[in-house]
Every structure is written in structure tokens, then in C-alpha cells.
Amino acid sequence: MKQLLFDLCRIGGVSGSEEPIAKFCAEKLSAFADTTIDKNGNVIATLGNANADKTILLDAHLDRIGFIVTSINENGFVKVASCGGIDVRVLSDAVLVSCSDEPVKGVVCCMPPHLSDGGEDKAAPIDKVWIDFGLPYEKVAEKIKIGDVLTFYGEPKELMNNRITAPALDDRCGIAALIRCAELIGKKELSYKVVILLSVQEETYGTGAKTGAYRINADEAIAVDVSFASQPDVSGQYAGVELAKGPMICISPILSKAMSDKLISVAKEKNIPFQYEPISGTTGTNADHISVTKSGVASCLLYTSPSPRD
């Protein structure tokens, strides 16, 4: 499972450019399910009883945050705009890599503190950031084009105490969990149809969830994503959330209470540890889109780990 997650995190797939990760996931799922990639780039895998009256949808998103190239200046420095929610605090000196057939690495330029006048001690906004690929304009223009996408470069790493760190754990954790789910279900005879939707563009517009859920027309849905955990100075609802203490079941007025209660009931019955995430409104995940598809889909949200236990 760990190797699968590491493999997933090494693959590109910035919003709108999910082809590499879609292809990888489709190949994995095809071993267990009837799998296709639709015209929007969603991966759709069908298991269980194809003729059943009831369909349950399991969703995780393919895309990861990144950047789109907007201009290249005469010195070969590249300007970008964000694709998804970028925390500008992590950009200083970050290494980015182009999502192309021949990836090229560059570093985010920042003002050295020795040269700063004191007014540049805050994180620079995206529109003030330049990427340095270490090449003159002519060479950069050969390798980087306007509209190309970049993402954060970094190898998955194993930490102590069975912890890991990697780029794109949002939502490669969810994908790993659903691939494992497909493996466990396999060719089992079920009284209902299960459709796994690995959706595109969650980080930007939710296109994949909107169109995929419309096509699948499920009765019920579980969206699988990631959330926050306790760390120094964190207070409020996340202060008590801990790693390795089980997935978080979301409680929200826009979700189906019956579905959320069912998740809680099953977890207790099977002795699966879990935690709560209460949210007072929309969740910022694909569950928001899926729940209002067509005449409505009874939806719940699971913030999961890639542990087979969960």
C-alpha cells in the first residue's frame, strides 16, 4: 500500500492536465473492474452488480495543485499563475518541475534578506513570483511554453513512527484507498452496483465531480478526501485530531445525516477507529457537487488515510 501511494505521489496531474495520473490509475483499476476514461478525463470503474437497482458512488480526485505558465521574460525567468489553492508561504526557494515529457526543474526566486529593505519580509503573492530554470531565454523557450503546467518537486519520504511525507497526498491518499477498495471488492457478488469515480479538476472548479456524478446517476455517494490534524498552535476543532487515530467522518448540514450515521455505525460495529469533523456549511470537497447532482444524491464525506484498516 505504501509503495502504491508513493507511486501515485510521484506522478503529475495538475488540475486540467490529469492525463498521466488518469492513465496510471485506469491501469491499476482495470485489474479489478470494468474501467474507462471519459471525455473529461475522469476515471470510472464499475464493480458489483451492473444490473442492480441501487448504485453507490465512491469519489476521490485525481488532480493536484500547481501552476500555469503565463509569461517568459527576456532573461528566461518564468511567471506563473496558480492552479488551485497555493499557500504562498511555502514558495520561497521551492523547487518546481514542469509536467512535460522531459521534465525541467526550476527554483522560485525570492529576495535575499541581506538585500531586503525590510518591506519584503512577507510571503510574495503569486503575481510577484518568478521561476528561474537556470537557462537563457532561448533554452527556456525550447523547454517551457505559455500554458505549460508546473508542480512542486519532491520525492515521497518515510519519516519515523511509520509516518510519511509527500507532495500531492491531497488526494492521492483517497485514490490509494479506493484502488485498495476495488481490489477488496474484486469480482464479489453484490446486491448493488459500485462505481469508483476518480475525478478531475477538484482543486479548481469541480468539473469532474459535476459531470461524472451526472453520468453515473448514483443513489448514494461517499467522497474521499484529506483534512487537517493537530500540530503546534492548532486550536479549535482540529486540536484533538491525531494521525493514526482513524479517518474523519464529516458531519455537515449539506451532507446526508443518514449516510454519515451509517458510516459511524459501521465503524463502531467493525471496531474501526474514527474521528469526527463537524463543518457548519459546505465542505470544500466534491461532496458539495455530488450531493446536488440531478435530483440529489445522498452523500457523505470521509477524510481518510491510506491505511487498509480504514
Predicted segments, located by residue:
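N-terminal hydrophobic/helix-forming segments and targeting peptides
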Residues: 1-305, 309
